[in-house]
């Protein structure tokens, strides 16, 4: 976690702008439901 962010801010950023790995997991999850 960057020292200039609070845990809550970092948590929010991670959900607004997921890392590529998280995005890939999310896409795989969506694809599984389609």
Curated annotation (Swiss-Prot):
Belongs to the pancreatic ribonuclease family. This is Ribonuclease PL1. GO terms for molecular function: lyase activity; ribonuclease A activity. Keywords: Endonuclease, Glycoprotein, Hydrolase, Lyase, Lysosome, Nuclease. Glycans are attached at residue 4. It catalyses: an [RNA] containing cytidine + H2O = an [RNA]-3'-cytidine-3'-phosphate + a 5'-hydroxy-ribonucleotide-3'-[RNA]; an [RNA] containing uridine + H2O = an [RNA]-3'-uridine-3'-phosphate + a 5'-hydroxy-ribonucleotide-3'-[RNA]. It comes from the Eukaryota. It is an enzyme of class 4 (lyase). Its EC number is 4.6.1.18. It is found in: Lysosome. Its main location: other. GO terms for cellular component: lysosome. The keyword Glycoprotein applies. The active site is at 15 (proton acceptor). Gene3D superfamilies: Ribonuclease A-like domain (3.10.130.10).
């Amino acid at each position: 976690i960057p020292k200039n962010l609070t845990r809550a801010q970092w948590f929010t950023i991670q959900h607004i702008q997921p890392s590529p790995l998280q995005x890939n997991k999310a896409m795989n999850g969506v694809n599984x439901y389609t």
